């Protein structure tokens, strides 16, 4: 984000709006987060070092944050297993702690949080772990809203993310109650007894 001038970011935001799209920006420090929000960026990705002031800027602008807490934990596991240089382990541990503090600030500030992971390659196996990491700070209901209704809002797709007349009937039927234990969604699909896509079952396990 910081390598772009205000005029460049504004031009990207305006051009995206003309195409009915939006701009997302990878931001870590508070100054970048606040600047992106004030310039019209719709989603702030990561926001690892967010503070109260930058959170207020995001809220005032009506922007969203996608915390991606799992990427740091997954990389930390890799470092501890010797798959990354040893010097990275301490740094990742520090960033992991900070990401949870940031999530607390976001939650307390009432920001609209999307759900994403930023995982690539072999780290894809950690995708659903985001649910249980965010449980350390957020309620199950808030996490579910992030993964459904808020993500649909971010994408400007009003027919997604909700179960109501006029919406796409894209529904997961879970063996368990995610409001009681969000961990049922972190089992790599093993807890899914049925999957419905546009009103048609594509998986059904009676």
Language-model segments: which ranges?
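Glycine-centered positions in the ABC transporter ATPase nucleotide-binding domain
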Residues: 198-199
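Active-site beta-loop-alpha junctions enriched in small/polar residues
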Residues: 28-30, 49, 68-72, 118-122
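Short, charged, surface-exposed secondary-structure boundary motifs
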Residues: 52-59, 75-79, 143, 183, ...
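Short, compositionally biased
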Residues: 184-193
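Histidine/acidic residue-rich metal-binding segments in metalloenzymes
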Residues: 1-65, 79-83, 92-113
């Amino acid at each position: 984000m910081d390598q772009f001038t205000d005029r460049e970011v504004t031009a990207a935001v305006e051009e995206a709006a003309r195409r009915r799209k939006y701009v997302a920006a990878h931001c870590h420090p508070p100054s970048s987060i606040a600047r992106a929000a004030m310039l019209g960026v719709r989603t702030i990705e990561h926001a690892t070092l967010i503070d109260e002031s930058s959170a207020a800027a995001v809220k005032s602008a009506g922007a969203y944050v996608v915390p991606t807490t799992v990427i740091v934990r997954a990389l930390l596991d890799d470092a501890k297993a010797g798959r990354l240089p040893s010097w990275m382990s301490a740094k990742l541990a520090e960033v992991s702690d900070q990401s949870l503090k940031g999530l607390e600030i976001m939650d307390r500030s009432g920001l609209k949080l999307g759900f994403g992971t930023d995982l690539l390659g072999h780290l894809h196996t950690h995708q659903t772990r985001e649910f249980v990491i965010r449980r350390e700070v957020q309620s199950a209901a808030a996490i579910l809203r992030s993964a459904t209704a808020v993500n649909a809002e971010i994408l400007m797709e009003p027919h997604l993310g909700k179960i109501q007349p006029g919406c796409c009937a894209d529904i997961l039927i879970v063996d368990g109650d995610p409001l009681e234990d969000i961990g049922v969604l972190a089992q790599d699909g093993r807890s899914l007894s049925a999957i419905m896509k546009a009103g048609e079952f594509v998986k059904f396990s009676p």
